[in-house]
UniProtKB/Swiss-Prot annotation:
Residue spans crossing the bilayer: none
Record HAMAP family: RapZ_like (MF_00636)
Its biological purpose: Displays ATPase and GTPase activities.
Keywords: ATP-binding, GTP-binding, Nucleotide-binding
Domain of life: Bacteria
Protein family per UniProt: Belongs to the RapZ-like family.
One example GO MF annotation: GTP binding
Binding site for ATP: G13, M14, S15, G16, A17, G18, K19, T20
Keyword flag Nucleotide-binding: yes
Protein name: Nucleotide-binding protein SPJ_1472
Species lineage: Bacteria, Bacillati, Bacillota, Bacilli, Lactobacillales
Pfam families: PapZ_C, RapZ-like_N
Coiled coil location: none
UniProt-annotated binding residues for GTP: D63, M64, R65, S66
Amino acid sequence: MTKKQLHLVIVTGMSGAGKTVAIQSFEDLGCFTIDNMPPALLPKFLQLVEIKEDNPKLALVVDMRSRSFFSEIQAVLDELENQDGLDFKILFLDAADKELVARYKETRRSHPLAADGRILDGIKLERELLAPLKNMSQNVVDTTELTPRELRKTLAEQFSDQEQAQSFRIEVMSFGFKYGIPIDADLVFDVRFLPNPYYLPELRNQTGVDEPVYDYVMNHPESEDFYQHLLALIEPILPSYQKEGKSVLTIAMGCTGGQHRSVAFAKRLVQDLSKNWSVNEGHRDKDRRKETVNRS
């Protein structure tokens, strides 16, 4: 049996340079992440990792918050070099001293190495101690001029493989306004102005995924006209959402009860967007009325 390859990114660098944003970015890229991993525990942790998927990916922040960081990190890295089945890279985040001082002042935090309270002294000492590690790093990112969003984009470009680069996902869902707008929706569209199958006895207990209801909703001229305008609005903006580093875009279609019109529209939208994007389909309230009837 072929041993599975373990991919590891060790995130380190200057305090205040953006390691928290970085580890969140790796999580969005599908990595298992841990913040503030003590260096001495790293080799043992990697041995204990239960590999359940092919090509598992890890991203761990290892920095000077661990008191033994400077004394242990070199020996740990040497050990990792000799570990079979491990592909690891070091990501070092840096920023100009002036910018780091400004960030510390903004958060009103003290630098962990500033014994006398002077932030700049702590930064200079940390930079000196981290110089060997920076020289060993395969990826050095200067975050001085980067916003958190720009840093996420930079890391995605550097560390995404082809599959991850396409990890932008669209969630299309239907819902009923009577039960509230989904709190995680990015785009919300209201189709309550369309003819309602609820008032037809033969369609009332069916849903928009059923062909008779779907055809009833979508075959109305106003439905087709609105849908084409909707598609023309949504399709051009999807690349911009992806470019901005958004990992999931949730599009919610709403009608009164979330059983007929919104379900049909969500189904149609999924069919079209799936031609070029990764799309998931969901119907929050589709069966809610049925569940209510069964309980009564």
